[in-house]
Amino acid sequence: MDVNPTLLFLKVPAQNAISTTFPYTGDPPYSHGTGTGYTMDTVNRTHQYSEKGKWTTNTETGAPQLNPIDGPLPEDNEPSGYAQTDCVLEAMAFLEESHPGIFENSCLETMEVVQQTRVDRLTQGRQTYDWTLNRNQPAATALANTIEVFRSNGLTANESGRLIDFLKDVMESMDKEEMEITTHFQRKRRVRDNMTKKMVTQRTIGKKKQRVNKRSYLIRALTLNTMTKDAERGKLKRRAIATPGMQIRGFVYFVETLARSICEKLEQSGLPVGGNEKKAKLANVVRKMMTNSQDTELSFTITGDNTKWNENQNPRMFLAMITYITKNQPEWFRNILSIAPIMFSNKMARLGKGYMFESKRMKLRTQIPAEMLASIDLKYFNESTRKKIEKIRPLLIDGTASLSPGMMMGMFNMLSTVLGVSILNLGQKKYTKTTYWWDGLQSSDDFALIVNAPNHEGIQAGVDRFYRTCKLVGINMSKKKSYINRTGTFEFTSFFYRYGFVANFSMELPSFGVSGINESADMSIGVTVIKNNMINNDLGPATAQMALQLFIKDYRYTYRCHRGDTQIQTRRSFELKKLWEQTRSKAGLLVSDGGPNLYNIRNLHIPEVCLKWELMDEDYQGRLCNPLNPFVSHKEIESVNNAVVMPAHGPAKSMEYDAVATTHSWIPKRNRSILNTSQRGILEDEQMYQKCCNLFEKFFPSSSYRRPVGISSMVEAMVSRARIDARIDFESGRIKKEEFAEIMKICSTIEELRRQK
C-alpha cells in the first residue's frame, strides 16, 4: 500500500513535526584515520581570528605566543578574539551589582570544596593525555602514573590524598631542573619455534627510566592531546577535541567548581541543570519577558548561534574574570584558581598521530609522525595540506603546536557561560537607559536572546547593541546563522519552544534498541528507555506499546531467543525448544530463555525476573539465580546499575536501570590481542589498580565507607577495619575463638611485612 507522506502530517501541528527533520536515525558518522589535519585547522583558525594581536616568546619553552587581548576594536561581521579587558571587568561588576554577594558566596562554597576534594576526583573521566607515556590512557591509569613519577622524584605532598596537595606537587614539578620518568618499550627478536621450526617474532615488554629536562617537561605538562570528535550528526566535516593531562585537570576542576556555583545562582544560565529542570528555568525567563511586554511593547526572540565560540574565547580573559570574582579572597585561593587560565595561555596542542601515505604503485604505506612535519619536504602533500603545514610550522615544537589564544572544546563551559550571562544581564532598562531592553538564556556557546521594545526600530537597535557589546568581550554572534521570531517560538540547546516546550522525540531515537551489554542488562535498559520517554518526552501509550513490541522483536533477533514454540530456526532454537518442553510454567521463562513477553506499558518499572518470579518453576529459579553457577563470572550487582545511553545530542548520558543478578548478567572477557602489544605493561598496571580497589571495597561496604581523613594508607585502613570487624563478630558469637585468633595473626603478619618493606 502506498502512503502519501503528507497525509501523515495533516492532523499534526507544524511544530510537532519538526523532529522528523532531524538527522537522528541510522548510525552517526565516525572518523577514521588521524585527527592531525583537524587539529591543524583548529590551531590555524584560532590564530587567524587573533592575527592582529602581539607576538611574544615564552621564556621557558621558547614557544611563540599570540596575545590578542586589548587588540584593535573588533570589526563588524568578522569573528575575532580581540576581547577588551576593561569591558569584561565592567560586565563582571554589573553582574555583581545585579546579584549582590553572588561572587562572595560562590567563593566560600568553592573554598570548602577545594579543602575537601580528594585526588581520586581526577580518576573520573575517560581518556586522558598521559604525559609520562605521551599518549592517551584511562584517567585512573594516567593519574596513577603521574603520582608514581612524582613520588620517585621526591614530590610527596600528594600522599595526604587531598587534591590541593597533589596540585602543590604539580607546581613544584614545574620548578625542577629535570624529571625522571618510566616509559614502556618493546623489544622484538627473531627466534626459531621449536614445534614448527619456523622463525617467529617474539616481543618482550620492558620499562626504562628516562630523564626529561625542564623545557621538555613543561611542554608535556602544558600539552593537550587532540582527537577527532566522533558521532557528530548533521555535519559534513569532523572537528578536533582536546584532552588535557593530569597537571591541568585539577586546576580546571576548581575553576569550573567556582563557575558552576555562580551559574546555579543565575536565572539566565542553562548550565549546570538539564532536562526538565532546565526547561522550567527557561520557561520562567520567557514568561517574565512576555508578561512585561504589555500591549504597548513588541517582544522578539533570537535563536542565537555564535561563530567559533572556542577559538575566540581567551584564557587571559578568564584570568581577568577570576581575578575580579575572587577579589578580597585569601591569597592562596586566588593563586590556585588563576593557575588554570595561566596554563591555558601557554598551552600546546599535540598534533596526534600524523599523516598516512600510501603509494598505489609500490604497494607501500608509511606514516609521517607529527614530529616530522616541521622538517619534511612539502612536495609529498596535496595543496590544502601543504598550506596548513606552512602556516603551522612557525608554531611547532617537538610535534606540538603552540596555541596561546582560544580554548579548545569543552574546557571551561561553566566559566564561559558566566561571561555570556554577564552580557545578557546588561539588557536591563537601568543599564540600557533607553526604551529597549533584553534578557535571555545562555548555555556554553548556545544562546537565546529576547528583546522587548515599543516598535520595530527599537528591537533592531536592541539587537545591534547586544551584538556590539558581545564583540567587546570576544563573543561573535553570527548574523547568518541566527534568526529572529516573535517571542513564543525559538530553539535553545535543541529544545524547541512554541508557547511551551515541544517534545523533540527524535533526539531520543538512538537510545531505543538493544544495547549489547548482556541479556539481563539489555532487557532492563530497553524497557527503562521506553518508560523514561513516556515520562519526559510525550511518548504516548499507543506509540509506547508499539515501541515495546519492536524492542522485544529486536531483542529476540539479537540474542536468537525466539519463543520456544516458534518455527524460526536459529543456533539456539534446539536448546530453547528443549527447555520450553520440560518447563511446566512456560510464562515463567525469561524472554532470553525463549519465554513469552509479559511487559506492557503499565509494568515497565519492574525488572523481568521480579515480574515472572512467582510464575517460575522451582528448579528454573534455582538455576537462574544461583551465584555458584559455574558458567557465570559474577560481579556483585548493586540493585541499581548505570547504563550509558546515546542521546542524539551532547555526551553519552548515564541512565539508571534496575539490575537483578542472574545467570544472564555475564561480563564479556577482554579482547586478548592487547596482550601482545606494548600496552601490555599498562594493562597489568591497570588490573593491579582494579584489584586493589575491589579489595578495598570488600572491606568498606559503601554504606560505612567514609573518605579517609589523615594519612592512613589503604592497607592500614583495611587492617584496622578487619580487626574491628573480627572483634565484633567474635563477641557476638558469629565466629569461633580459633578463627578470631587466625584473623589477628594475619593482620599482624601484614603489618610486619609493611615494616620490613
UniProtKB/Swiss-Prot annotation:
Keywords noted in UniProt? Eukaryotic host gene expression shutoff by virus, Eukaryotic host transcription shutoff by virus, Host cytoplasm, Host gene expression shutoff by virus, Host nucleus, Host-virus interaction, Inhibition of host RNA polymerase II by virus, Nucleotide-binding, Nucleotidyltransferase, Phosphoprotein, RNA-directed RNA polymerase, Transferase, Viral RNA replication, Viral transcription
The EC code for this enzyme is 2.7.7.48
Q: Name one GO biological process term.
A: viral RNA genome replication
Give a Gene Ontology cellular component term annotated to this protein. Answer: host cell nucleus
Q: Does the keyword Transferase apply?
A: yes
- Which residue spans traverse the membrane? none
Spell out the post-translational modification annotation for this entry. Answer: Phosphorylated by host PRKCA.
Superkingdom of the source? Viruses
Residues of the RdRp catalytic domain? 286-483
Any Pfam family hit: Flu_PB1
* Compositional bias ranges of the Polar residues kind: 55-64
Q: Position of motif Nuclear localization signal? A: 187-195, 203-216
Major place of localization? Answer: host cell
GO MF annotation terms: nucleotide binding; RNA binding; RNA-directed RNA polymerase activity
Which catalysed reactions does the entry list for this protein?
RNA(n) + a ribonucleoside 5'-triphosphate = RNA(n+1) + diphosphate
Top-level EC class, please?
A: transferase
Subunit and interaction comment: Influenza RNA polymerase is composed of three subunits: PB1, PB2 and PA. Interacts (via N-terminus) with PA (via C-terminus). Interacts (via C-terminus) with PB2 (via N-terminus); this interaction is essential for transcription initiation.
Matching entries from HAMAP family are given as:
INFV_RDRP (MF_04065)
Describe the function of this protein: RNA-dependent RNA polymerase which is responsible for replication and transcription of virus RNA segments. The transcription of viral mRNAs occurs by a unique mechanism called cap-snatching. 5' methylated caps of cellular mRNAs are cleaved after 10-13 nucleotides by PA. In turn, these short capped RNAs are used as primers by PB1 for transcription of viral mRNAs. During virus replication, PB1 initiates RNA synthesis and copy vRNA into complementary RNA (cRNA) which in turn serves as a template for the production of more vRNAs.
Q: What is this protein called?
A: RNA-directed RNA polymerase catalytic subunit
Q: Which gene encodes it?
A: PB1
